[in-house]
Amino acid sequence: MNAPHTHDTVADGAAIEATVADIADTGRRALTRREQKEAYENNKLFKRIVRQVGQAIGDYNMIEQGDKVMVCLSGGKDSYAMLDVLLRLRERAPIDFDIVAVNLDQKQPGFPEHVLPEYLTQIGVPFHIENQDTYSIVKRLVPEGKTTCSLCSRLRRGILYRVAGELGATKIALGHHRDDILQTLLLNMFYGGKLKGMPPKLQSDDGRNVVIRPLAYVKETDLEKFAELREFPIIPCNLCGSQPNLKRAEMKALIRDWDKRFPGRVDNMFSALANVVPSHLMDTTQFPFASLRATGQADPQGDIAFDEEPCASGDDTATRDGARPISIVQFDDL
């Protein structure tokens, strides 16, 4: 593992946190109205992302005292942003935890091996580069024209679990965001026939690791703006990202279309993931339908058999009794 000698935490965030006050020092000019607005919006964006990540960590107890968090860094916008924000939060956190960045070099042709080591050394973050030629394995085993995501993901997952053990990491942080979670929900509904999303925190399938997703509440569009603002040295994925006709790409386009044409719909979908009512679904493993009997006592979650659901009227503000909205989606500054 490489441990740089410098120990600066987050790379200088002055551009993001710049105030809109007059900066007319000697030889400098005041900000124009447009520049003031841009600085203000950039500052709001940064604070919003930090707040959302902090809330997700708190809501799901993602990081605890003494944790060693292995931040999986792919070189994409999401993982860069996750590392950047976690470093920032660590400065203010009431607990102590360590961060180590890990990149899996899958030996894709043209992969710029120098980019991540240089970046991580510059910002003073300990890191480990794991070299494994999964690219050749995937290209050999997956027929031409078929998507490589499934096999690539399985290989990558196994390697990262092993590396986490070798490094003594107690948490594995992945850069999936709100849109990824919703896309997974729709993919499972449309093509898998099940109500299954992507949890903010889970035990790994090998039973040895806890995986966390600190960006769970963050919109992808915000991460795109943030990455551009921070000028992260983005490394494009030419193995899976360029594959045409991916079902996930269809879900992404669908969600963005809904978000544009029906304001609030996507926020409500996301909120629904934390407002599950098993008694009003059809899974007999989640609710004892077979043994259900009339108790003679009123039940606020009971079926209003002959009434229309409040939301059926088109009133998006209606909330079923007992529903627990995710407060983070009620943004006041979006």
UniProtKB/Swiss-Prot annotation:
<comment type="subunit">
    <text>Homodimer.</text>
</comment>
<keyword id="KW-0547">Nucleotide-binding</keyword>
<dbReference type="GO" id="GO:0005737">
    <property type="term" value="C:cytoplasm"/>
</dbReference>
<dbReference type="InterPro" id="IPR012089">
    <property type="entry name" value="tRNA_Cyd_32_2_STrfase"/>
</dbReference>
<keyword id="KW-0408">Iron</keyword>
<dbReference type="GO" id="GO:0034227">
    <property type="term" value="P:tRNA thio-modification"/>
</dbReference>
<keyword id="KW-0963">Cytoplasm</keyword>
<dbReference type="GO" id="GO:0005524">
    <property type="term" value="F:ATP binding"/>
</dbReference>
<dbReference type="InterPro" id="IPR011063">
    <property type="entry name" value="TilS/TtcA_N"/>
</dbReference>
<keyword id="KW-0819">tRNA processing</keyword>
<keyword id="KW-0460">Magnesium</keyword>
<keyword id="KW-0694">RNA-binding</keyword>
<dbReference type="GO" id="GO:0000287">
    <property type="term" value="F:magnesium ion binding"/>
</dbReference>
<comment type="similarity">
    <text>Belongs to the TtcA family.</text>
</comment>
<protein>
    <recommendedName>
        <fullName>tRNA-cytidine(32) 2-sulfurtransferase</fullName>
        <ecNumber>2.8.1.-</ecNumber>
    </recommendedName>
</protein>
<dbReference type="GO" id="GO:0016783">
    <property type="term" value="F:sulfurtransferase activity"/>
</dbReference>
<keyword id="KW-0411">Iron-sulfur</keyword>
<keyword id="KW-0067">ATP-binding</keyword>
<comment type="function">
    <text>Catalyzes the ATP-dependent 2-thiolation of cytidine in position 32 of tRNA, to form 2-thiocytidine (s(2)C32). The sulfur atoms are provided by the cysteine/cysteine desulfurase (IscS) system.</text>
</comment>
<feature type="short sequence motif" description="PP-loop motif">
    <location>
        <begin position="74"/>
        <end position="79"/>
    </location>
</feature>
<keyword id="KW-0479">Metal-binding</keyword>
<feature type="binding site">
    <location>
        <position position="149"/>
    </location>
    <ligand>
        <name>[4Fe-4S] cluster</name>
    </ligand>
</feature>
<keyword id="KW-0004">4Fe-4S</keyword>
<keyword id="KW-0808">Transferase</keyword>
<feature type="binding site">
    <location>
        <position position="240"/>
    </location>
    <ligand>
        <name>[4Fe-4S] cluster</name>
    </ligand>
</feature>
<dbReference type="GO" id="GO:0000049">
    <property type="term" value="F:tRNA binding"/>
</dbReference>
<dbReference type="GO" id="GO:0051539">
    <property type="term" value="F:4 iron, 4 sulfur cluster binding"/>
</dbReference>
<feature type="binding site">
    <location>
        <position position="152"/>
    </location>
    <ligand>
        <name>[4Fe-4S] cluster</name>
    </ligand>
</feature>
<keyword id="KW-0820">tRNA-binding</keyword>
<dbReference type="InterPro" id="IPR014729">
    <property type="entry name" value="Rossmann-like_a/b/a_fold"/>
</dbReference>
<comment type="pathway">
    <text>tRNA modification.</text>
</comment>
<dbReference type="Pfam" id="PF01171">
    <property type="entry name" value="ATP_bind_3"/>
</dbReference>
